[in-house]
Amino acid sequence: MTMLRRFEIYSLDPKASQAKVAAMHASMRNAQRYIPEVLHSAVGRNESDVALHFVWEHAYESAQSYQRYKVHAFHANIYDRYLLNDSPERIVTDNPYDVGLLGYSCEAPIYLLPPGAARRLVLLRLAEGQADFFRAITAEAQSRNPQLILSVLAENTFGTRWLDGVTQILETTTYSHIWEQGYESLAAAAAAGSDWRASAGAAVEKVIELWYELDAGYEE
């Protein structure tokens, strides 16, 4: 059965109270306590200079599990109040990066890191036909950096799908691919750098990078 790997990435309203931000953080970190369909839920605060502040990463066993999550009462009663444009309790903002919901399909939890590890998330728009070329670059980057303990490159299928996570409604999206990198520490993730960009050249048309420590609601 094909799993769905998913990210929600937000900029926070500077006027939002710390109490509300903390409440959203806790509700997303501990999502699997309230919505059984949610797997491997973790949150993080972005430490890069990209003005995106909050990342919620998680997964679903199947598209059907994801669809049940979307109509769960906890989603409507708790998450939507923090996120929806028409909610008076909204604490996130629109951002100039055209980033919000991203993700991909996989056959197993190939993305999984232990709690307390760090993620470096590279969002890319690759030129047409360059995915295999760039995949070789990711493999080379991992071979050169022993601190890069996990590397996954995948097409951002969530960016072009409807709310069911399956039905394609757009031909393209701003970031065509996601490169997940895993490190044992935030310091290692921050120090990893982007030397790979020189090799990628024109194959990469657009890119932003985020890194954060995993505050995980799951056990290793």
Write out the residue ranges for each language-model feature.
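Regulatory input/activation interfaces that engage signals or partners
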Residues: 83
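Short S/T/G/P-rich N-terminal loop/turn motif that feeds into the first structured element of a domain
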Residues: 1-57, 61-71, 87-220
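Short, well-ordered, aromatic-rich surface patches in folded extracellular/luminal domains
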Residues: 75-78, 87
